[in-house]
Structures are given as structure tokens and as C-alpha cells.
Amino acid sequence: MSTSVAENKALSASGDVNASDASVPPELLTRHPLQNRWALWYLKADRNKEWEDCLKMVSLFDTVEDFWSLYNHIQSAGGLNWGSDYYLFKEGIKPMWEDVNNVQGGRWLVVVDKQKLQRRTQLLDHYWLELLMAIVGEQFDEYGDYICGAVVNVRQKGDKVSLWTRDATRDDVNLRIGQVLKQKLSIPDTEILRYEVHKDSSARTSSTVKPRICLPAKDPAPVKEKGPAATTSPSNPGTEATGTSPATPTP
């Protein structure tokens, strides 16, 4: 896309434009297509219904202007009630693990824990909007085809924002996507980003899932050299030293 989503935010607020008005800038008369068509879904949890029955599609869009029109007319992520979710996925991909585009994939997970309650709304809105602009604006470069969609889960115990990718085995691709995500969301080095495999999440027996990849909070302490031939790295080096975990995750 030649013009970024952020640069075109003002275009969405222009309303109907009179084409005969010579004073109207030409860019306000032009719609700016996105590379993909996107679907926004909403879910409000109801224990009396099946999960899929609670999931509703809100809208489809494929231009910058329609993106901002939709975003500006729905409740912000920070304003959603507990138990609510937003899902933004490429058209044709359902926001569920079982979808053929997601079943072999995983997600990068950003947690806004309850200890940050005082700035929770601001932080959640920032993470969600920056993530939306990054995916619809194709800011992941050549890795955009691996991206399926984004999710925000609003929970009293702690909110979650996640980016779903289609192939959990491509550690190189997912690591790079995670690095871009960290930069786009301005996530500080004190926060740890986790990449979780959907199959591990669906089969979990506890509240936590061992991540396949981590972007560590800080670089590990350097290893002391024992001699010229010493090449030993810290135990479990894949996660902390390089940002990747062993090739085969442990459930």
C-alpha cells in the first residue's frame, strides 16, 4: 500500500465530498485500497450459549477510509465490558483455532496485567490500535502472508492482545514478526513477548502454556570464558540468548 493507514486517518473523517468543489484536495476524492480485505468480529461471552454462537461478524472493509470509519464508530478496546473480544482477521479466516488457516499456527501474546489497572485503558487502546494499523497497513513486509489476524481479549484478571500467524513451525518468520510487533507497539524491554502454538493452547491442562519462542525482557548475563576453547552458552540458550526456543515445544 503506497500510503500508510496512519497517514490517511484524516481522510476517513471527511464525510461526503462534493466532486464539483474545486477546493477539495484530490486525495479526499480517492479511496485508498488495502492489500487485503478484513473482517471485524465481536464476541460477548455467554455461559448459556456455545462459543461460536456468541461470535458475530461486525463488518468487512478493504480501504483505509472504511477502516477508520469503522474504528471511529465502535467501542474502543479499553471500553469493552469484561468477557468481550474483538477479532480482526483476513476475509475467509474464522477467528478460531480449528480454521484451516489457523490450525497449524500460533500467536504472539501481549498481556496487560491487572497490576497496571491505573493506565490499563490507555495501554490497551494503544496496543490494539497500533496492532490494527500494522496488520492492515502491511507493515510486516514479506512476512505479511503468514499473518492471519489480531485479537483483543478483555478480562478482569488481565487483558490480552495477540497476533495470530499461520505456521508455528517457521521460527525464523515468527521471530521476525515478533520483533516487528515489539517495535510497532513500543513494548519496553521489561515486558516479555511469548509465541504460543495453538495446538498447545487447545490441549493445555493449566492456565499457562510453554511458549515456543520468547523475546526476552533483557539480555542474559554474559558467559564467563573458561579458556580459549570455551564455547559453552547458558543452559537453555535458545530462548534467552537468541529469542528462540528449541525446535520442538514441550506441551
Curated annotation (Swiss-Prot):
Keyword Protein biosynthesis: yes
Localization annotation: Cytoplasmic granule; Cytoplasm, Perinuclear region
Residue spans of biased composition, Polar residues class: 230-251
A single Gene Ontology CC term: translation initiation complex
Consequence recorded when altering I74A: Abolishes interaction with mxt
Tissue expr: Highly expressed in the germline (at protein level).
Cross-referenced Pfam families: IF4E
Name of the protein: Eukaryotic translation initiation factor 4E-3
Organism: Caenorhabditis elegans
Gene designation: ife-3
